[in-house]
Amino acid sequence: MRQVTLDERTSLGEETSKKLRSNLPPGGWFPALRDLSWYITERNVVYIDLFLSPHLQKISIRAAWSRNNPDIPPAILPTLVPIISALPTSSLERISVSTNHLTMPWARFKDPLSSVILRCGPSFTEYDSPVPLSNAALDHLIHLPHLRTWRIHGPPPTYPASSLPLVFPPLRELTLGENAACGWLPLLKRLEEGASTTQRMTPLSKAKEFLKVLKIEDVFGINIGASFVSAVQRFRNLVSLRVCVYCHDRDDRGKCIFELNDDNVTELAMALTQLESLVLGYPCSENTCLTTVTCLLPISVHCSKLNRLSIHFNATNIADDLRNILENPRFQQLRSLPRCPLAFLDVYRMPLGLHGSDLEIVVKGMIDIFPSLAHCEGVEEGWEEFSGMIGDLQGYSK
């Protein structure tokens, strides 16, 4: 057997598990097991070691507890930690850890999981886990030549300028989770700018070529401004960029951390021309940000493959801004170029409050920017009428 899935319904029973343990053959019950998906519960955690194989390549751990009983069972952690520490690593390729528990004490797993990572070899390709790792484990991952998927939580190791890593893995997907972006984005910039060689190769050369998906799930400690654009735009082959920013995300001055303006967004769009999905913050419900509907035109023109968009922008003067796009000569050349195939626009809680002729101007302006637009999803006043008017003007009913 090469694949086993243990879920919340799996229970061998106490007698059966005792017999399995007492009669455990020298090579284990599953000597050829390659892929183990393990949904941890009080019932199955005590015999999970019976399913481990020295040839294990992929392990997915999900700590799933009942919503009716959200407290972590006290017996789970002391049992689980030593089992994780003992995971075989000679052929391990993938570690995935997740939970439905909002207060999972991930720090308890830092040392055992770090010890596992430090034993992983060059065949390791994926680390997808909210468990923080030691500096040594992080440095080890940085030097793994075939790492493709990495979810990072916490800051990077501290590297003096004279000892920056000379390599960085050829990642295809990078997720910056809790407290990660504020440290890792500057490090990536340092790797690119401070370690260039006469061969024009840098530690980021392969990552710049291969990275397709970048997700920033936690913006704590950073401002989404010009320096953010500078750090991200180097990954020119991205097909998906997701930056989770809301109006209530504030810096220590009480200001919204989303500081991009229309020119910044244009610069980003001109760099990331392969994007198919762009979530650049969630639409602003307070209309306080500097970006306006004007930035949507360069996005539509330069990101010609885009089919999903959500962006933080100010709709206070949306009708006037759209008139400006239609009438201002400086937009004439852009308006003559083909647009992206975007059909759906998520406007979240962005206020609109327009009706009648003013609303029609906005709808026509948005269709001019996104000719394939079929629907706008918004909960505030005016957006339902907006979507209905799109259908009328595009020649079909919604």
Descriptions of predicted regions:
Residues M1-K398:
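Leucine-rich repeat
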